[in-house]
A protein has these predicted regions:
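Amphipathic, low-complexity, repeat-rich surface-exposed segments
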Residues: 1-179
Length: 179
């Protein structure tokens, strides 16, 4: 896998620095932001604690019904997965609001920041990790890990096909005919 040039990473840092500058340039604004996020996390913790003792508790936040990543029923029925999901959604919502509500940022920088936040939050979604995705965890346990072995084999094949660069296959190339 080829590393990204440092200039791309520095561009992300510069963009996020402009957003952070707005939020951190005023102590009251920064404190208000921290208080809001802290309250959201404490509310989530309280909801999780009530559920643990058998009480019904309304979720702090729910995924969009169109978000296919969280359709498995265990995202709601299993307290661990439900907590991880809500924590992710609250954090993602906050990150998007930071960009949306930052004042004094030019439209181009805001668009870049929105794009970067979307990419990062999608990358860290609990649905992307074995231990925090109920479907993948179930399949891993049921197949004794064979699903992970197959996935790693396919990853190695994709890297080999790209000669060191990840070249993700989107279909079976043996079925394709030039013509």
């Amino acid at each position: 896998v080829i590393d990204k040039p440092p200039s791309e990473v520095s561009e992300v840092i510069k963009t996020f620095s402009k957003v952070a500058e707005y939020w951190l340039s005023d102590n009251a604004r920064a404190a208000e932001l921290q208080t809001k996020l802290g309250k959201a996390y404490l509310d989530l913790w309280g909801t999780a604690a009530r559920r643990m003792v058998g009480e019904q508790a309304k979720p702090a936040i729910e995924p969009s019904p169109r978000d296919k990543r969280f359709q498995d029923p265990e995202w709601k029925s299993n307290q661990f997965f439900d907590f991880v999901l809500q924590l992710y959604l609250l954090t993602t919502q906050c990150a998007h609001e930071l960009v949306k509500n930052a004042e004094g940022i030019d439209p181009h920088t805001r668009k870049k920041a929105e794009f970067y936040v979307q990419q990062i939050t999608n990358a860290i979604a609990p649905s992307n990790f074995v231990l925090t995705n109920p479907e993948v965890l179930r399949e891993t346990l049921a197949s004794n890990g064979d699903n992970l072995v197959r996935g790693m084999k396919m990853l190695a094949e994709d890297i080999e096909a790209g000669r060191g660069t990840l070249r993700i296959r989107q279909s079976d190339p043996s079925n394709l005919v030039v013509g």
